[in-house]
Amino acid sequence: IVDALVEAAENGKEVVVLVELRARFDEESNIEYSRKLEEAGCRVIYGLNGFKVHSKLCLITRKTDKGLEYITQIGTGNYNEKTSTLYTDLSLITAKQEIGKEAAEVFACLLRGETIEETHVLLVAPKCLQNKVLDMIDDEICHAKNREEAYIGIKINSLTDKVIIEKLVEASQAGVKIEMVVRGICCLIPGIPGYTENIKIISIVGRFLEHSRIYRFGTPEREKIYIASADFMTRNTIRRVEVAAPVLDDTLRARLDEMFDTMMKDDEKGKELTSNGTYVDRRVNAEKLDSQELFYEMAYKNAEKKTI
């Protein structure tokens, strides 16, 4: 990717790159890449004062007869050749102009050394992610209180954000069905009568490091679904620049739904968190299901077909 950006700059394209020098384990290589990019003529900026930039965002802007046209890539994982072979991540490439316009505003704010104050499509921390997640949880609470089916599905690495945890407890008490895949630290205990009996939490630790983040709100006919760079940790939701993008294409939405549902059925590497705080083996399927191996086989076959 660095080589491609260098080539673009050398071919006369305007290239702006934000490099977070505080990226753990990658500080030295990021400094070297920054020098290489600057030497090629790229404009390089180094994060945001007071906030770590953890979003993974690429925006291509083209001038056409009709004006500016955007192509946006938003991911859950870093542009890192080493971790990309070890981590599971998701990436969205879209020509949806409403997403591109807000991505452009994110970059504009970063160039000014500011955080974005308001969004309509993207969820962008530190000011426009946690509050919007809480609003979507509240929507499900309202549906449940009206005796309508309500659902929340979350896949993240860690859950420590007290405000979101308390809202999820409130949702469970209202009758919202909540399913969560939380790989690492989890400060919410499911299955406690009167509090979290409607919450199921599993952790998947397997061949690859689970790293993708998925947010699902609502039943199929009104579902909102996002992929994100942010875990539900206070450091992510209010102390970092993070981006979550809505998945608007029906085919991709169905694919994400299927992936999430498959992970919730994983009884090979998936362990269920119980009400006493321990993780236990589970048996869901007639034959053991390893979601990572299943997705790997699917990806391998699709790569052979050269299809997505």
Task: Please state what every model-predicted region is.
Residues 7, 11-83, 93, 98-100, ...:
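PLD/PLD-like phosphodiesterase catalytic module centered on the HKD motif
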Residues 85-88:
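Acidic/polar active-site rim loop that often engages polyanionic ligands
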Residues 98-117, 132:
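Short, compositionally biased "basic patch" segments
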Residues 113-122, 147-149:
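Gly-rich Lys/Arg/Thr-decorated short loops/hinges at beta-loop-alpha junctions or inter-strand turns
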